[in-house]
Design a protein with these regions (language model features):
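Residue-level "contact hotspot" at macromolecular interaction interfaces
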Residues: 118, 131-133
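Acidic-enriched and Gly/Ser
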Residues: 1-124, 138, 144-146, 150-192
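Short, Lys/Arg- and Gly-enriched loop/turn segments at beta-strand edges
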Residues: 133-139
Length: 192
């Protein structure tokens, strides 16, 4: 099974996904596939209030995992609003596993990357809960006012800095808890 990116008209991702599902359910050819419209939950500040909204991670793209890309392409190529499956020359461009792994791991069943709980101690970011808990990558910056963190994703052999939402928790005070927290309980990241 390999991962591919379907290029569609921006804003029509859900329609194309539904159309592909309909075509595949009617098809006699049994092809294993999975479609993900990667999204992120992001905090937006408006008039001093912070509210959470869902935005697409890669507008105009649907992520596709399949075991037979050529056959699937011939079934779906006439979908309205579908532009193409990303290619290199005449061959479909498979997304490297290391590029797609973070996105698939962080996203929930609906393809949404939610909020992470963090606290900042000196020059370290400590992730206590959420999709960033086991993120193994580069963190560019934290915006405490907007409650966002900027992380690096590689997608289609390009670097993408993506803003994700965070909940900033007050700094731990071991004296209040009455016990020490083992070092290995949290993942540490260096601020750059």
């Amino acid at each position: 099974m390999g991962w591919y990116a379907i290029f569609v008209m921006t804003g029509k991702e859900e329609l194309v996904k539904e159309e592909i599902d309909r075509i595949m359910s009617c098809s006699e050819t049994k092809i294993t596939y999975q479609l993900i419209i990667a999204k992120r939950e992001i905090n937006e500040r408006k008039n001093g209030n912070i509210r959470s909204v869902i935005k697409k991670l890669f507008p105009g793209y649907i992520l596709l995992e399949t075991d037979n890309i050529t056959e699937l392409y011939h079934l779906i190529k006439n979908c309205e609003y579908l532009i193409d499956i990303l290619r290199r020359g005449e061959y479909f461009s498979e997304i490297k596993l290391e590029e797609i792994a973070n996105i698939v791991y962080m996203a929930d069943d609906d393809g949404v990357i939610g909020n992470s709980d963090i606290y900042v101690e000196n020059d370290r970011i400590i992730v206590t809960k959420g999709p960033l808990k086991n993120y193994d990558g580069f963190i560019k910056k934290i915006d405490k006012r907007k409650q966002r963190i900027t992380v690096l994703f590689f997608f289609n052999n390009k670097e993408h800095f993506i803003d994700l939402s965070i909940n900033i928790i007050e700094k731990f005070d071991d004296k209040k808890i009455g016990k020490t927290i083992p070092f290995f309980a949290y993942r540490y990241y260096q601020l750059k």
